[in-house]
Amino acid sequence: VIGGDECNINEHPFLA
């Protein structure tokens, strides 16, 4: 994923 630690809800809602 992009950033990984970033956990951007906008790009990765599944990570949030």
UniProtKB/Swiss-Prot annotation:
Tissue spec: Expressed by the venom gland.
Keyword annotations: Disulfide bond, Hemostasis impairing toxin, Hydrolase, Protease, Secreted, Serine protease, Toxin
EC top class, as a word: hydrolase
Subcellular location: Secreted
EC number: 3.4.21.-
A biological-process GO annotation: proteolysis
Protein name, per record: Vipera russelli proteinase RVV-V homolog 1
A single Gene Ontology CC term: extracellular region
Function noted in UniProt: Snake venom serine protease that may act in the hemostasis system of the prey.
One Gene Ontology MF term: toxin activity
Similarity comment: Belongs to the peptidase S1 family. Snake venom subfamily.
